[in-house]
Structure formats: C-alpha cells, structure tokens
Amino acid sequence: MVRLAPHLVKPLPMIVPAFDGERPDRRLGVGLNLYDVMAVDKLRGRRKRDGQQDGDDFGGDWSPERHRIIEGDEVIERAPALAAREPTGGYLFYDCQTDDSRLVLTALEEAERFGAVVANRVDAVELVEKNGRAVGITARDVESGEQFVLNAANVVNATGVWADRLRPAELHDDAGLPKIRPSRGTHITLRNEDLPLNDGVIVPAGEGRSIFALPWLGSTLVGTTDNNYDETDLDHIKPADADIDYLLDATNSFFATSLTAADISGAFAGVRPLIATGDPKKSVDISRRAELYETGSGMITITGGKLTTWRRMAKMAVDRIVERDARDAPCRTEEIPLGQAIDAAQLPRVEGLPEEAYEQLAGRYGYRARDVLAVAAESGELAQPIVESGPLDLLAEVVFSARHEQARSVGDALLRRSRVALLAASEVAGEDRLVARRVAQAMATELGWDAARVDAEVDGFLDEAEAEGIVAHSSSAA
C-alpha cells in the first residue's frame, strides 16, 4: 500500500525500548530478523524484479530498512514520553500507518472511476435466489425506507462482521453457522502533549501481551484490546470501561505517567470478523487469516483478514469469479495507484490557513486537496477549523464530504469522513451542541435541510456519539 498510495500510507518507525542497563532481548532480535525477511527483503526483492528504484513508485520515496539497535538518547528523541524512564537503548524497526477512513474512501473513488456504482445509506436486506441460485439482493434505502431489488450475475458477500447475516436459503438452518466470531478492539486517543511521541512504541500490557502507542493525526493513539464480543449489536460498538482501564493502566505503568479518563481525547472500538474455529480459544489466539467460500447458491463470501490484506482479499474474490466464468481477466490492482499524491507546496493558498493544514490536506486527500481548498476559499467561515483550538480539520472538509463523498449526516462527516470526533470527542459531542450544530448548518446548505432537520441531525449525532462511546469513561471512576 505504501507503493500504491504513498500519500495515505506512511512509514512508521517502531521502538522496543530497554531500561536499567538491560540489553535488548535477543529473542526479540530473532523475531525481527524474521520480520525483515518476510517484509523488508520481500518488498526489496519485488522492486528489483520489477526494475524499480527507490523513489519511482507513484511519488513514493521510501524503502524500508532492516531493524537495528539504537542508543538511549535516540529512543528519547523518537519517544520523548519515555524520558523520565531513562531508556538505555532498544530496537528500531519499520511498519506503516494509515487513516483507514481515507484509505477506504479513496479506494471507493478509484472503483467509481472504473465504473463501479457506490451508494451510501443502503442496506442489504436479503439474498434473492432463483432456482437455488443467487441472482441479486433485496436492498433498502435507509433514509426513505424503500426496498428494491438489485439483480446481479455474481453476488459477493464482503460485509465483514455482518457476513453471516446474508445467507442463502440452504444455510438458514445450518448448525455449523455462524462462521464469524467477533472480537472487539478498543483504542483511546490522547493529546500529544500528554504523551509526546514522534514514532511508535510497543508497550507491554501483562500476560505476555503488548499494545501500541503511536503518533496519529496529530494526537497519540493507544491500543488495542482483543476480547470476545458476544453482543448482538454490530452497528454501534462501544468501548468497554474495563478495556479503557486496561489501556490506561498499561500506558501509565510503562511511561511512568498518571493519566486518567479525563485526559482521554476520544475512544472508539471496532469488531474484527475472525473466523470461528470451533474451539474455545480466546479471540487473541485466533488467526487473522482471510477465508473465501462458495455455497451451492453461487454466492461467494470473503471474510476474516485485516486492513493490511484488503486488496489481496478482493483479488481472491474476483479471481474466483473469473475462474468460474472461464474468463481471461488477470488482476491489475497491484499496479493501479489509489488517488494521486501531491506535494503540499504545490497546493493553492487560502488566506488564514496555517502551513500545517496544507500538509494534512495533502496527506489526507492527495491531489483532491485542491478541491477541498477551493471549498475553503468560498468563505472565511469554511476555512476555519471544525473545533476551535482542536485538530486542524476544516469546516470546508465537511462541505466537501457532503458534496463529493456522499456524507448524509453529521456522524458521516465527523466519524466516517474524518476522525475529528475521535480526537476531540468532548468538544464535538459537548452538551452545548455548538460544534455539532455548526457542522449540521454547513451540511444543510449542501443537502437542503431546513431548521427542523438541522435540529434532528444534531440530536441524531449526539445519540450516535453516545452509542459509539467516543467520550471515554473509566470503570474505576464510575
């Protein structure tokens, strides 16, 4: 992904610190050697086979390095939050990081460019079958409630954790289903000044587990947990108070801090679509592998996996259809860039915007940042941050999301087109409603909402924020 979308997927140095005169763990060094072979050397080998040099991949100029041992001073330089613990050294290795919402939206935009039809706020109600074969789905417009049939030569169920809810008739009573075993992962965000990091840090969390503390979108991201999720509601996954305590305790213990729930900028949880194995393993011990299966109806289901493997999973599904239909259509997505990177210095300037805003827009939208800035230039108000003294996300991005990215609610704009609600949850979901109303009013101009609809949208967002649990609570503070 760093090759296909260099503006969206960024290199992230990761640190495993050592303290009190310890030498870095040799067993970890062995593991990192294996990581180098599987990731670094594999990527370099592919570039060599393709005749590529570092820096010629769609504007990407990064090639991963093998891990190395670093001194304590460099650990502190990369992770100032560790200064109080006086690290003596550590391992440094490389991973990558993205804003998943922007990656998904960019992939959808590219799909549209190749002829796909993408629709927000449409539910898949049930599979449509004819003579035992899947021939489409019954869909529902969430806003109007209208149901309609979408006919298709091939039906692919790529609904993630919801995959078991779209079944052909032959499987309705199958005792072997569901195949999905949901696992909840919880994250918290902190102000960078409260836990300053320039690079990522692996944090021991007890019982042989580890979590991560990472610089993310101008804040610090801490996560993740990995627990069985047995509730039926998959639409709103709320962080458990105990999980928030777990993350805070591990962070405070490792960084010698005294952070509380009041210091958390935002919290969120998601559900992984793990493949059920039929044994009582904890979710953390279940493989993250992807699985594709086809039933007698002809419907193909692709599930499991993770964000890192999303393109390969899509290839698996389409390759199966191509093979089944005896067509000659080799996959090309390994060579198709996602969006178009742009240097922030090439973006047009809008009066009043700080220089950091251009860097953020270039990293978030690529070349389309020019279109966002054109919206910002329409009025001084749109060039202002959504949250005063908060993240740099602009009100113009809200309008852009409604105009070009099918955002249909305040939640769409603040939770699923940007991450501002997860970085400044108390401000965005505050009782004074000022931020939510400001966003709703900006969207109203684009979507034709009247005053009553604006009020309803503000209420709806605050209800959604509560259901998603973005304002963190601690069980110890309850």
Regions found by a protein language model. Give the residues of each.
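Residues that recognize and position ribonucleotide moieties
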Residues: 68, 117, 148, 181, ...
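Flavin-dependent oxidoreductases
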Residues: 130-133, 141-214
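Long, low-complexity intrinsically disordered regulatory segments of eukaryotic signaling proteins
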Residues: 3-6
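A structural signal for short hydrophobic beta-strand segments in well-ordered beta-sheet cores
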Residues: 124-127, 212-213, 292
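Helical element adjacent to the flavin cofactor pocket in flavoenzyme catalytic cores
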Residues: 91-154, 314
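C-terminal accessory subdomains/tails of enzymes that are appended
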Residues: 8, 19-38, 44-48, 52-54, ...
